[in-house]
Amino acid sequence: MENSSIVKSPNPTIEEQRNEIEKLKNLTGIEEVHVDGAKVNKRKRTFDEQSEITKDYIEYDFSKIEDTKGGYLLEEKKVEDLREKPAERELREQEERQKKLRLAPLNLDPETAPKCFECDSIELDTKYFDIFHCRVCHTCREKYPDKYSLLTKTECKLDYLLTEPELQDQELLPRLLKANPHQQGWSNMMLYLRYQVEEFAKKKWGSMEALDAEFERREVQKKEMKEKKFEKQLLELRKRTRTSNYSRMSIREKRKHVHSYDEEFEKPNEPGVIVQRCKCGLEIEQLEI
């Protein structure tokens, strides 16, 4: 068996180097071979491995793309509008939560389904059940307005003497948000369930009678403060009026006084001393020589 030998020329040509590289690739299975003094032969990428820039076109899933009307398309995640106010965001989240609750399947099992407090009906008001956690149907809600009617935040402050931190705590008093009917850009209108507000007021003040007594005390205190404020303003007005009158009198009626010593008498216990007196009370003494 003869041993084959490869004779390498001292100065191989470029064609010989290429042939040698191809032989090494076939023997070793390597796709890239680095040779000193030669350029690197890189493997070409397949179509799937090409970058987004080198591709002939870019694939988009239009089911995950939203047209923002801004000249470009945004994928997957919806970018939150930074101009949305916190009040608007809170109202939108509440509406989305109520929509999901309305679309949820109704539990028709009479054993496990939640029932109305008043009539045991399973057709509950989803808004009251979701926000106030109150099991009441539409019929009973309209039938008992003294219990299930809604109160504004101002009414809770004035009639039940509740504070702002208490009304902002949703664990104490759940609230229903509605767009402000007076101005669209204003804060949302907050509505509270009447019987929940009354129960919290009883816990805070002890009883409704104690609440009425506190209300009367504050009304009397408010009236006294109002009267004191009025008296203070009246006193300030009188001071300003008196000062202005005096200034006008001093400017218009005040004239230059000229002393006239009409009264003249001798000073007692001091003979020879003559006293002259003016109507304004000024006195001068003269000594007779």
Curated annotation (Swiss-Prot):
Its main location: nucleus. Zn(2+) binds at C116, C119, C137, C140. Signal peptide: none annotated. CDD domains: DBD_Rad14. A zinc finger (unnamed) spans 116-140. InterPro entries: DNA-bd_dom_put_sf (IPR009061), XPA/RAD14 (IPR000465), XPA_C (IPR022656), XPA_sf (IPR037129), Znf_XPA_CS (IPR022652). One of its GO terms (biological process) is base-excision repair. Belongs to the XPA family. Interacts with hrq1. This is DNA repair protein rad14. It comes from Schizosaccharomyces pombe (strain 972 / ATCC 24843) (Fission yeast). The lineage of its organism: Eukaryota, Fungi, Dikarya, Ascomycota, Taphrinomycotina.
